[in-house]
């Protein structure tokens, strides 16, 4: 016999607001877990719009474009937590959030691999002169020679900053035969 966990506040009374195109999967996940008052808006809201919208919100999900200053937090009388679905939390006034008792969390590894792949992709694009060749091809000129085109293999890559992203760039670069 399984028992349903008793919460201190009924899930169906908790209001959740997601901004900036937070994934539909997140909305579905919350709804599947009994949270019925979940709204998702496509973009970031201005400070004035946030003040109008946030009064009955218990959980706010944002990305990097939405800014939550003290004035917005003062209007957020029911807010319990802000989920920043991005690397940092610098868009939230953390001191004001702490004074208001609002928990702020982020997703520090959410795009680490994506950024590392873009770095490697940009390196390939530049070393192979893809922008020049693409421009020429669109002008009807096919540059068939390989002069000035190189491979990443054997090249040396210097990484400034060896945090989450830098270490992932290193893994990908080494897999391509680069010296890091």
Name the predicted role of every residue range.
Residues 21-23, 42-45, 64-67, 87-89, ...:
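Short beta->alpha connector loops
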Residues 9, 145-180:
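Rossmann-like dinucleotide/phosphate-binding beta-alpha-beta segment
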Residues 29, 118, 122, 168, ...:
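Rossmann-fold NAD(P)-dependent oxidoreductase module
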Residues 39, 57-136, 146-153:
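Phosphate/diphosphate ligand-binding glycine-rich loop within oxidoreductases
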Residues 15-17, 61, 83, 158:
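Short, well-ordered beta-strand segments
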Residues 1-57:
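N-terminal glycine-/charge-rich "phosphate-binding" loop or analogous flexible N-terminal tail
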Residues 28, 51-52, 70, 74, ...:
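Alpha-helical segments flanking ligand/cofactor-binding loops in enzyme cores
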Residues 32, 55, 97-99, 175:
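Residues at the C-terminal ends
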